[in-house]
Curated annotation (Swiss-Prot):
GO molecular function: aminoacyl-tRNA deacylase activity; ATP binding; isoleucine-tRNA ligase activity; tRNA binding; zinc ion binding
Biological process according to GO: isoleucyl-tRNA aminoacylation
Top-level taxonomy: Bacteria, Pseudomonadati, Pseudomonadota, Gammaproteobacteria, Pseudomonadales
Domain notes: IleRS has two distinct active sites: one for aminoacylation and one for editing. The misactivated valine is translocated from the active site to the editing site, which sterically excludes the correctly activated isoleucine. The single editing site contains two valyl binding pockets, one specific for each substrate (Val-AMP or Val-tRNA(Ile)).
Transmembrane segments annotated in the record for this chain: none
CC cofactor: Zn(2+)
Chain sites annotated for binding ATP: K611
CDD domains in the record: Anticodon_Ia_Ile_BEm (cd07960), IleRS_core (cd00818)
HAMAP family in the record: Ile_tRNA_synth_type1 (MF_02002)
Pfam families named in the record: Anticodon_1, tRNA-synt_1, zf-FPG_IleRS
Name of the featured protein: Isoleucine--tRNA ligase
Motif segment ('KMSKS' region): 608-612
Similarity remark: Belongs to the class-I aminoacyl-tRNA synthetase family. IleS type 1 subfamily.
Amino acid sequence: MTDYKATLNLPSTAFPMKAGLPQREPEILQRWNSIDLYRKLRQIGEGRPKFILHDGPPYANGNIHIGHAVNKVIKDMIVRSRTLAGFDAPYVPGWDCHGLPIEHKVETTFGKNQPADLTRERCRAYAAEQIEGQKADFIRLGVLGDWDNPYKTMDFANEAGEIRALAKMVEGGFVFKGLKPVNWCFDCGSALAEAEVEYQDKKSDAIDVAFDVEDADKLAAAFGLASLAKRASIVIWTTTPWTIPANQALNVHPEFVYALVDTGERLLVLAEELVESCLQRYGLAGEIIARCEGKALELIRFRHPFYERFAPVYLADYVETGAGTGIVHSAPAYGEDDFRSCKHYGMENDDILGPVQSNGVYVSDLPFFGGQFIWKANPAIVEKLAEVGALLKHESIQHSYMHCWRHKTPLIYRATAQWFVGMDKVAHDGSSLRRRALDAIEQTEFVPAWGQARLHGMIAGRPDWCISRQRTWGVPIPFFLHKESGELHPRTVELMEQVAQRVEQGGIEAWSKLDAAELLGDEAAQYEKITDTLDVWFDSGTTHWHVMRGSHPMGHEQGPRADLYLEGSDQHRGWFHSSLLTGAAIDGHAPYKGLLTHGFTVDENGRKMSKSLGNVIAPQEITDSMGADILRLWVSATDYSGEMAVSKQILQRSADAYRRIRNTARFLLSNLDGFDPAQHMAPNDQLIALDRWAIDRALLLQREIEEAYTTYKFWNVYQKVHNFCVQELGGFYLDIIKDRQYTTGADSLPRRSCQTALYHIAEALVRWIAPILAFTAEEIWQYLPGERNESVMLNTWYEGLAELPEGFELGRPFWDKVMEVKAAVNKELENQRNAKAIGGNLQAEVTLYAEESLAGELARLGSELRFVLITSAVDIAPLAQAPAEAVDSELAGLKLLVRKTEHSKCGRCWHHLPDVGSHAEHPEICGRCVENIEGAGEVRHYA
């Protein structure tokens, strides 16, 4: 038997079938490094339109987790796709370095009592060490960026830039000192930002407390009575007994109806709609003897249960009747609403009682409870209320309560003297920061769109921003306050610039070492140099000022507004929020044109990642076992607008999809063996019809892919690429062309036409996947034929794809119909194989009984229809002639009849044909193969 293998164009490539990503990816990283890819991208980007994605800095503490990986991969997909779209898209990674978590870590290691300068030195060293670890992990994910020059908020230039940003806000009239309740953590010993507060369930003491009336005549008059016949009390309900020693007022809603209830022993004032539930709670019977609106109770005084002072009634719209009594006890030092209400009624700061110290302990001279920690004092306060006859009910309730994000301990609101950025303070230009920020939101594009309403609601309802902290490791607030008046030095902005210049040279330590006399001269004795530091959200929130336009070597190129900020959805109250406020204050607009948010990672059951649940998947595990490209493919395939489910099983599905894409690329490469595009590319107008369709289909797909990348719908890119590889290529085109590719002459037009199409598709495909499968695309790039530059990323979207001309004989609708017919035939062939009626498809001869229009369409392929259906023979007959044994197909107007061929198998092309054995010199092969070996070669037009 003759071996015809040498006469076939069998596929061949050195591109490995097995990816081996954990081993191969580090080699590709080394290659990118050796060719200085990032710098080359900046060089070729000169003169291109810019696209700036400004990096929200992760905190420089601990290993990266899967959420970090998701964030950086999405950013990288955007930067890479914008680069391929012809933009200059630099990416400067950053780190957030100051703040309590690092200071806490250093204190845990070295103790709390070390000198402040030593603490700062150790914090700086610790942050630098953490950055190196995180940086290595981000690079391993394939994230392309300026890793040699990242920005760090602890860089001296950035610390100085932050002071300059603060000076701009002082100059604009937005910064003031005030006494206000702020979120306070006893363990931190400092105020916390809103973004540092999380809510957990907490068990609390809920108490109903009676305040006896002092102005009995006024209370009687309010209820339309001549006098009160017995002891009368107003009742409050609270879950914070520890605030009772700080009570200074009582709040009622001006429009609610309040009832005077006779319970026998005493009269109680309660909101009318809560009377029944309150009496039931107290185990009392009673009847309403009078009613009045809340506004009638204004300024009537009641006695504190155990201190010799009075609590007047103030009107407040925030009072609700969802629980409690409809009356709120007001401790202005420990509640935002309470504080506002008391200030509205003229209470001076000096009159506000604040018996709780920064460590949560009452001042020592507080009667009854001095020196006690507030949480431990609760039982004693309840006991005291019972002792004086003021306690009507005590029970324990479970409710959601604010906790420190770091220590997981309960927080309180605590009025302290702090520095604030005023939301409603009218700036020098007559506008408020709140108005500026809300206007800026309207000018910002949000992905997903619901982010706009969310951020708008947060800005509309937020209090003034407390920017001061009482910590060591942070950028100083370099203010000098007059010792008598408490006012800022009149040259504050000028002095801040002088401090910034010193910090630029010596870091934040320059402020702690500074002698006030160096700047103030003889005035120094009159001024106090403050020691507060800035909220870390001010650090990251001003990077648009001191990184995008300042400290970074690329800063001047980036300008005042980034095209995009991209972080997790929690950053609406974090980095997006603080950046918006500082941008609106300094520049009058947001520092970003667009905001993109992604959801959090959960396991396959929708549960939060947690060590206790054992469902945590570290990105390092994925890169070590499966490769970064598998993680990147999973990110691309997942709709990030909601929760992002990840598990080993889900990642395995991504690995399976990866293999299908890789195998498609390998098929393309192996069939381009020996193809030199400079010599062998067939002209477009000479290409076989099916090849022209394949190129046209790739062009249409590329347009859809470009649109999906532009709108950040990476899951659409994934689906389109995967479906193209599996269905249109793997399930249709590549299957059909194998015969032509392998059996026609090596340099024949049918084969070169096919290779031309494969080449165009490969050139396009490698670019489509480059933003997602960064490593694999680079690997494919090295195996593609023809002259090319060093990296796929040094190119733009492929421009060699040609559209089918209008009126082309076999256009898109034609091939869509052919695919449907092929799917119907494949289904019946599979049935026949399963029934053992045929072996392979080439043992089959098919008759298509088709209605007239379909028959006419299929007939256009002539004898080449069999190559499309991959059977040895195809006949077309009228649908009306279909015999009883013909099988219905899912395609209307088509029936099928498959029969096993009686002809011999060609030993070269494996088709079963009547002329096999008719050629004396080649008795084992068909006439077509003889022509392809010895003659001019077969002619193909369509397939």
